[in-house]
Amino acid sequence: MTALFQQLPSVDKILKTPQGLQLITEFGHTAVVATCRELLTQARQFIKKNNQLPEYFSNFDRTFLEIHSHLQKQNQVQIKAVHNLTGTVLHTNLGRALWSEAAQQAALSAMQKNVSLEYDLDEGKRSHRDNYISELLCKLTGAEAACIVNNNAAAVLLMLATFAQGKEVIISRGELIEIGGAFRIPDIMEQAGCHLVEVGTTNRTHLKDYRNAITENTAFLMKVHSSNYQICGFTSSVSEEELTELGQEMNVPVVTDLGSGALVDLSQYGLPKEPTVQEKIAQGVDLVSFSGDKLLGGVQAGIIVGKKEWIEQLQAHPLKRVLRCDKVILAGLEATLRLYLNPEKLTEKLPTLRLLTQPLKQLKINAMRLKERLESRLNSQFELQIEASQAQIGSGSQPMERIPSVAVTIAEKTNAKLSALSARFKQLSQPIIGRMENGKIWLDLRSLADIETLLNTLDEL
């Protein structure tokens, strides 16, 4: 065994070879040294266990190939572009909404240049970083003011911490939601230092339940939109309109966590109806929070709109600075919101709406092209079909609703295994992510952003 250890080259010997010098030129001295040490450590452990040299140390050429391979993997970006063929348009694990071209350009400009983030160009003095977007949101929603933080969970936390610390927040039992990542409304309330007061039952809550729970220690009445589940059957709930009337009567503000946050009526596009921010403001809600990267189709952000007196208090809270967005996110958000000033062009300019409203005819054409390319690459190892599919919006939006779609399905035909094919899909330069259902791989075209790039990627198979 000692003789085997002696056959291992030293780091210094590797570095002084022509191949070693080439590796240093390509990857840098520090990275090459670290990789050599790592592989030598692994080789010593292998020798102890197997009493033989690992193959990649059997000759110098193999050794340098192994070092080069490790260095290449180390340099690869791990958050990489994928082809979304899951049928879930706003897929949380795949990054939710795609940014519009306008948002991308605005963000790129903010990255490369100094921008008027907190500077009033007209007055020539400092301003607030939310000002530009606040003006836009007021125009779009009818609210008096707006506040921007880094996601909707942060928006909820900020509202609770600002107005309800040490006080009571009244909410229906049927709205004590949990969303992805174990985010629970009661847990956020506990973190904010407020006291949860549950009213009603899971399936039925009445206005009198809220009224009877109000005390002099009540901070506000809270409504949470149940976007990621539905309670059906024998149910009853209280609308924001009813709740705001009660709030005005009892001098208690009303807050709504809308979650997905649509700014247009989706039913006009043949999609499931989702309550809009404008509707909640019109119903008299004091504060409405929602996400920027769900139905809005933009960047990850938490947006709060509502009465000016309440927004000013949010802006003054110390947590606001902790939760604020940077210039890139704000630039992308502003550009996204400006698209809503021309709603007639939204399905053309906003990727989320473009994907959700693609006609089935176009999806069938894309499916035929995809099937043809797959058949040419897989050599009859699998059975491929074009089938009707059911896509979904995703990210907790309309979980019970499905959108007609088209998919290419792949089933086992010979000894070739779907699991092996799925693994091959994930090893491509731009991995292909589909879904497994009924013993088949489903490649749903509804959620695919670019058919041409996908077809080019498949040439790697």
Swiss-Prot record:
SUPFAM superfamilies: PLP-dependent transferases (SSF53383). It is an enzyme of class 2 (transferase). Its cofactor is pyridoxal 5'-phosphate. It catalyses: L-seryl-tRNA(Sec) + selenophosphate + H(+) = L-selenocysteinyl-tRNA(Sec) + phosphate. Converts seryl-tRNA(Sec) to selenocysteinyl-tRNA(Sec) required for selenoprotein biosynthesis. Belongs to the SelA family. PANTHER family: L-SERYL-TRNA(SEC) SELENIUM TRANSFERASE. This is L-seryl-tRNA(Sec) selenium transferase. It comes from Haemophilus influenzae (strain ATCC 51907 / DSM 11121 / KW20 / Rd). The gene is selA.
